[in-house]
UniProtKB/Swiss-Prot annotation:
Subunit: May form heterododecamers with RVB2. Component of the SWR1 chromatin remodeling complex, the INO80 chromatin remodeling complex, and of the R2TP complex.
One of the record's GO molecular function terms: ATP binding
Reaction catalyzed: ATP + H2O = ADP + phosphate + H(+)
GO-annotated biological processes: box C/D snoRNP assembly; chromatin remodeling; DNA repair; regulation of transcription by RNA polymerase II
Record Gene3D superfamilies: 1.10.8.60, P-loop containing nucleotide triphosphate hydrolases (3.40.50.300), RuvB-like helicase, domain II (2.40.50.360)
Main localisation: nucleus
Record PANTHER family: RUVB-RELATED REPTIN AND PONTIN
Function: DNA helicase which participates in several chromatin remodeling complexes, including the SWR1 and the INO80 complexes. The SWR1 complex mediates the ATP-dependent exchange of histone H2A for the H2A variant HZT1 leading to transcriptional regulation of selected genes by chromatin remodeling. The INO80 complex remodels chromatin by shifting nucleosomes and is involved in DNA repair. Also involved in pre-rRNA processing.
Name assigned to this protein: RuvB-like helicase 1
Catalytic EC class: hydrolase
Organism: Yarrowia lipolytica (strain CLIB 122 / E 150)
Pfam families for this protein: TIP49, TIP49_C
Amino acid sequence: MVQINEIKSNSRDTRTAAHTHIRGLGLNEMGVAKPIDAGFVGQTEAREALGLVVDLIRASKMSGRGILLAGGPGTGKTALALAVSQELGPKVPFCPIVGSEIFSAEVKKTAALMENFRRAIGLRIKETKDIYEGEVTELTPEEAEDPLGGYGKTIRSVVVGLKSYRGTKQLRLDPKIYESIQKERVAVGDVIYIEANTGAVKRVGRSDAYATEFDLETEEYVPLPKGEVHKKKEIVQDVTLHDLDVANARPQGGQDVMSMMGSLMKPKKTEITDKLREEVNKKVQSYIDQGVAELVPGVLFIDEVNMLDVECFTYLNRALESTISPIVILASNRGMCRVRGVDDDVSPHGITTDLLDRLLIVRTLPYSLDEIKTIIQKRAVVEQQQISEDALDALAQHGARTSLRYGLQLLSPAGVLAKSEGRDVVEVKDVEECESLFLDATRSKGRFTDKFL
């Protein structure tokens, strides 16, 4: 009998985060929200509203506008913002921050806001490069007498033979390129490409014609390049404006020890000046005018926006109306509350009225008992927990009475208790024991108010 053994994977499981189950907004072709889809349960009006926002972003008609997600705690505001980013795809920049992140002792609040604004604006650069690509058939350095005299010799040039499916070419290259070839450890039989303009050399891998060779080192074998050796290749790069700011604010020095030590001695976060950003904007505009680059407005999501103060709101008013601006999504769980920085100004959601006028407000509603039950059931599937119907009802009751988060947080401890007793299915007694061990906010507040205050 032939013995067959299963190989168990040693890879670690990915962590199950709070919004792992969210995969999109869950809309049909007409933009109507399905009751239960893509990890969402309920919130159909908010999902349909954000579906329209996604369509506007894709049509590049939403730049410089703001959305406010207003609703109580645990109603899915952060999940909705995450769903928008997943609907837009990985090519559109999405920068999530919390309102308290911008306060720093080293960088001004307005500078931190502008930095995150520029993180959320992408630049898609399309560049056509002349390259030579093929398998190395010859690698011969040509030597010459040292002009300074002596017995030493210098590399005058290097002859490289490249082969592809459509033919072969022999190139005579500059000695500086020979240094790049040595750094990449290129040998005969390797597949490389050389950029004609910059002279940059990139080793792609070993030709698959040598795949039968036995070597101690694991090689990546690649097929022989198609087409001619000399070809034009379009390369698309996605960067953000903040990446360009940082690259120009901190130009890299040499690779010597002193340059490295100098960079280590300056760990302090420096502020990028407005003058530098204007220079970067001019360069970006010239790229756009030439048709080399395309601006991709992304999404800046600011959670707990009520933590910002009046100076930040004033700055947001101006930043939203600038020529280069992303789509800004704000989230707040406050009703009427005081605006930070102003003692007597009480405003809806903790936001100044002049900024509220510039926002489209999307309301999130509290979940019903049936919706909470469905959400907990979906989370149990994501966390690979088996739960009985009675235990599911008990968790849903806790979620409706206290908060959805409390009901979800009892799920994992209840699973641990069930496994400690040798059961795979979570029962009601596991949920009740977890409820006695872990207090919710309301019970905790009542108990400690009586004892200590």
